[in-house]
Amino acid sequence: MNKQTSTPSQIHRLQQTIYENLPVGMELYDGDGYLIEINRGGLKMMGVKDKQDMLGINIFENPNIPVEMKRRLRAGENIRFTVKYDFDLAKAHYPTVLSGISYFEITVSVVLDENKEIDKFLFIAQDV
């Protein structure tokens, strides 16, 4: 039996395809809370067409994220919570075509660097 191995390039393309086509929103923030990456699912959930309109927003300035969740993130905790997301509040931070209220289930994984300092925050969100 001939076993085919994948090249690093093929693996990267596969990972990118999965990431872009997941039916959930994925957002990656740097250690200071600034958005550095978002997938198509995340853009759709936020009502934004152009990724550039969202890059650079800060999760700690988002009025829709509860203060307690922000505190826990700063402390380096992995968290999961449901949020009542008000798009009218969000419009002060990014241009969304949505308005009103949605509910999202959000899971956040804290990524640590080699010194065990917060390097990134990975948000996975789904509409509930």
Predicted regions and their residues:
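Amphipathic alpha-helical coiled-coil "transmission" helices that mediate dimerization
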Residues: 1-6, 10
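PAS/PAC or PAS-like capping segment
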Residues: 5, 127-128
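Sensory modules in modular signal-transduction proteins
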Residues: 9-33
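Conserved hydrophobic beta-strand signature of PAS-family and PAS-like sensory domains
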Residues: 35-37
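N-terminal capping loop/helix in small sensory signaling domains highlighted by a polar->aromatic N-x2-3-F motif
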Residues: 39-42
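Glycine-centered C-terminal helix-capping/turn motifs at helix ends
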Residues: 46-49, 55-56, 64
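Terminal output helix/cap of sensory domains in signal transduction proteins
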Residues: 61-100
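PAS-family sensory domains
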Residues: 106-109, 116-127
